[in-house]
Amino acid sequence: MRFIPLQTEQQVSCWAAQHIINRINDFKPTAERPFVLGLPTGGTPLKTYQELIRLYQAGKVSFKHVVTFNMDEYVALPEEHPESYHSFMYNNFFNHIDILPENINILNGNTDDHNAECHRYEEKIKSYGKIHLFMGGVGVDGHIAFNEPASSLSSRTRIKTLTQDTLIANSRFFNNDVTQVPKYALTIGVGTLLDAEEVMILATGHQKALAVQAAVEGSINHLWTVSALQMHRHFVLVCDEAAQQELKVKTVKYFTELEGSVAGTDYQDK
């Protein structure tokens, strides 16, 4: 695990964006050998997308040879709905960079056969070999994508029933009316995420502190989905100060010193 303890949400966003750009540029993608990037939606990554757009406009990166796979999508919510994850991604990221439309992959929550759609998505990922970097956020209960507490840690892309906590949390995007929030979603599985070459999770705000504690100091437990990433060879957790509040002082000190010792070396992004 690589734990990046920062001070502010803006620092988290800038660090994450620069890490993504470094990975893409170091990979030197081509049309025949694209960089495969997994992406989330929600409030946490929004500033990271804004920073990526800024750096793209500054000529620091091109997304022309990047293929993206999003984590999830609501079921039975039209793509053109302002709160669909299709709309979120195009409005907040894709419309502002040079990514090719055919390289964008988002689950179709309006298909008649959800199982077939989930299988198709898994096969599409496999056709590229693997996802090189999957960025995600984490819920207050430790869920990643829509892998709610008690999800199988070997699960694949599938349809999930959303918990009441998730419905309440997401109601802020639906006029604070929980009845408007779709009750089902298609989501990548925990196993799908673990297959990625690298996973980078962003956590900001004091409400994420217990999830961060579970990810860093807790045991692997299907009630805290994020804890499964302890098994991943290249797991990066980037947090602001508020999200570190439940960690032991010596834990934060250890990782802070560790980051300082590798800064500027070839091991910094390992």
Curated annotation (Swiss-Prot):
Pathway: Amino-sugar metabolism; N-acetylneuraminate degradation; D-fructose 6-phosphate from N-acetylneuraminate: step 5/5. Catalyzes the reversible isomerization-deamination of glucosamine 6-phosphate (GlcN6P) to form fructose 6-phosphate (Fru6P) and ammonium ion. Allosterically activated by N-acetylglucosamine 6-phosphate (GlcNAc6P). Pfam families: Glucosamine_iso. The record marks 151, 158, 160-161, 254 as: Part of the allosteric site. It catalyses: alpha-D-glucosamine 6-phosphate + H2O = beta-D-fructose 6-phosphate + NH4(+). Keywords: Allosteric enzyme, Carbohydrate metabolism, Hydrolase. The gene is nagB. Gene3D superfamilies: 3.40.50.1360. It comes from the Bacteria. This is Glucosamine-6-phosphate deaminase. It comes from Haemophilus influenzae (strain 86-028NP).
